[in-house]
């Protein structure tokens, strides 16, 4: 007979939890001297509820992760069913049925030619794996090309916080302190926004592609891969690339024999209106990096998809030393795979992508009305994401002193109106779960507008 478990101790009150939070938790991307706790206790669809019962629209999809809302019945059931079987098995030389099925389903929905799936734990890890695979691929290609060791990256790119991802990242405030630990990529200006360090406007589509071609020609035989966020650079401040840029990059990288790594950690799984952003321009990369929405925001999991051509370069007897000696303890975790499978089922069975155009148009209509606001310098909108850039003046444009944190103030003010938002500098970002209703979009945009009005007054 099993012993009766002891009763749970009563949960500490909200004030005690907040004190423990300040004392013990080091929050990511947060200046802890200024941190004020907000403790989220539960979620309901597009809403989050704190320990005091206050409700907030999840306007950032819990850091761009949540797809179908919180506590979706099918996802909850899939997680519970898998936990009743096994919660974790290693992916190092072992597998499980759920992870195998998930890999197969990912291949089915991914762009053509991406047939192999390497699982890891988060977006940085997905990019890190792609960089290392691309580097090792050229060493083991037939014939080997040992000189292909360079990577091409884009200005203001963000690919994560592990060292390889930091190296190809271009957001200076995130990466500069770690520069001595990393390698130097070949950096191209972004076609999506004004360079913050030089003030130079984004080059045109033609100029951007011509520059890429000159770089690839000047570095013939030296470039392993180009890595980029397709269509939309999220952490740069919601920078949107001109239509045709991605397709042009694919044509040029293929022409010069350079692998193309697309980082869809943020923009994959319906965010731009198609399942993957690269499908907007019918582009199939050599690597596709996925995380965040991979499990619809339920569990940390990532995947790096690549081609059979790349995979074959790693096959051989053990003594040939062709193995990819890289991996993480929780790569291919069956709990994450189970929820990921259920998420793909929801996309298919609930017509998620088919239902997006009306929501996208509602979001566009709301943010467009802010264009005349005296302190809204620019609005950038694509799919189910919008960036509203604040400025001290519009003509000519004058940025607020960065120390004033106007974007953060706008988001904190929006919180008082029932929405949780997170800015990118002075860009107020709207990035709700795809499941958000039209009425909830109205409420989210009203809260954001109120926050902007309060933060820019006076």
Where are these regions (language model features)?
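Conserved N-terminal phosphate-binding loop of PLP-dependent enzymes in the Aspartate aminotransferase
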Residues: 2-458
């Amino acid at each position: 007979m099993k012993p009766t478990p002891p009763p749970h101790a009563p949960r500490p009150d909200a004030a005690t939890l907040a004190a423990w939070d300040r004392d013990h938790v080091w929050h990511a991307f947060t200046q802890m001297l200024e941190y004020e706790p907000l403790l989220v206790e539960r979620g309901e669809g597009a809403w989050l509820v704190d320990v005091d019962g206050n409700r907030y629209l999840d306007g950032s999809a819990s850091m761009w992760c949540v797809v179908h809302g919180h506590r979706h019945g099918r996802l909850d059931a899939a997680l519970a069913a898998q936990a009743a079987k096994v919660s974790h098995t290693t992916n190092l030389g072992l597998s499980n049925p759920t992870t195998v099925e998930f890999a197969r389903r990912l291949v089915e929905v991914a762009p053509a030619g991406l047939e192999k799936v390497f699982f890891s734990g988060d977006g940085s890890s997905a990019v890190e794996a792609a960089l290392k695979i691309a580097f090792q691929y050229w060493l083991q290609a037939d014939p080997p090309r040992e000189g292909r060791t360079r990577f091409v990256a884009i200005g203001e790119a963000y690919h994560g916080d592990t060292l390889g991802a930091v190296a190809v990242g271009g957001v200076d405030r995130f990466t500069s302190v770690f520069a001595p630990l990393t390698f130097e990529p070949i950096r191209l200006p972004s076609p999506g926004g004004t360079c913050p360090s030089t003030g130079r406007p984004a080059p045109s589509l033609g100029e951007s592609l011509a520059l890429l071609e000159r770089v690839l020609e000047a570095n013939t035989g030296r470039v392993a891969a180009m890595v980029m966020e397709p269509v939309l650079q999220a952490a740069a401040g919601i920078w949107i690339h001109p239509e045709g840029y991605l397709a042009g990059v694919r044509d040029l990288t293929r022409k010069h024999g350079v692998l193309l790594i697309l980082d869809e950690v943020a923009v994959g799984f319906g965010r731009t209106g198609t399942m993957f952003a690269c499908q907007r321009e019918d582009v199939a990369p050599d690597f596709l990096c996925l995380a965040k929405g991979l499990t619809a925001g339920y569990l940390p999991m990532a995947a790096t998809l690549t081609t059979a051509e790349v995979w074959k370069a790693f096959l051989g007897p053990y003594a040939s030393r062709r193995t990819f000696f890289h991996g993480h303890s929780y790569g291919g975790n069956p709990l994450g795979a189970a929820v990921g499978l259920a998420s793909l089922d929801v996309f298919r069975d609930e017509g998620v992508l088919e239902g997006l155009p009306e929501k996208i148009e509602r979001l566009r209509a709301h943010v467009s009305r802010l264009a005349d606001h005296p302190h809204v310098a620019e609005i950038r909108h694509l799919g189910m994401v919008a960036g509203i850039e604040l400025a001290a003046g519009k003509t000519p444009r004058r940025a607020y002193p960065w120390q004033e944190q106007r974007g953060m103030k706008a988001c904190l003010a929006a919180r008082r109106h029932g929405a949780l938002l997170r800015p990118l500098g002075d860009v107020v970002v709207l990035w709700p779960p795809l499941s958000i209703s039209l009425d909830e979009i109205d409420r989210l945009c009203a809260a954001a507008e109120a926050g902007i009005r309060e933060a820019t007054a006076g």
